[in-house]
Every structure is written in C-alpha cells, then in structure tokens.
Amino acid sequence: MLSNTYSETALENARNVAPLLSDAAGEIEAERALTPAVLDAMHDAKLFRLTLPHRDNGLELPLPALAQVAEIIAGADASAGWCLGQAFGCAMSAAFMDKVPAQQVFGTRDAVLAWGAGV
C-alpha cells in the first residue's frame, strides 16, 4: 500500500532528524527560530510536505502517521514540533486551491507556510 510506504519513510526520516533537533534545542530556544541546519534537514526529510496533496508533490500522509511524526519531532524539540504542526495545517489548504496558485505557494523544495498571530 502506497500510504504505508510513505508513512514508514516519514517516520524513519523523523527519527533521523530528531538527534539534530535535540542537539540544536538550546540554540533554537536562544534564537527563537529554527536554525538553518534544522530547516535544511527538515526540508531534506520532506517533513513539511507530509500533508500536501500528491498533485503538489506532497505525501498526503494519513492522520495516525502524522501524529507519530509530530510526536517524534516535538519530543526532540518542542519548537520544531510546533512549527511542523503549523505547517501541517497550512499545507492542507493546498487541497482546496487551484493547481497553479498551490504550485506558486508550495512548489519549491523549501516551501513552508505557517500563520498565526504575530507578537
């Protein structure tokens, strides 16, 4: 089954990224931002593409696998987990967009969208 393969890959990728997140936790907290190395690793692992539709080069991961990925990432660094959770919800919006605007927003490797109140 395709989604099982995607789920296993996503879980493996999350486990592989987790040590980097744990190691960077102090810097992430001090800077109040994910580090460039953390972002690169998360993008390389396609963690921000897990809820994007297949048509937008996403993985459309099922909810149980998403929860497991979120648990792994948040367990390694809560801030990275929060950012990933924001990205999960925002990326789901691509399913309701026409293809061209969705590609404009989510088409590049390092595309990630999050929204919320600015402070």
Which role fits each region the language model picked out?
Residues 3, 7-10, 14, 35, ...:
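Generic structural signal for well-ordered, non-membrane alpha-helical segments
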Residues 36-44, 49-119:
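Glycine-rich flavin
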Residues 1, 8, 21-23, 49, ...:
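General secondary-structure edge motif
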Residues 32:
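Active-site-proximal polar cores
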Residues 4, 11-12, 18-21, 25-28:
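N- or domain-start disorder-to-order transition segments that initiate the globular core
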Residues 28-29, 60:
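Residue-level marker of alpha-helix boundaries and capping positions
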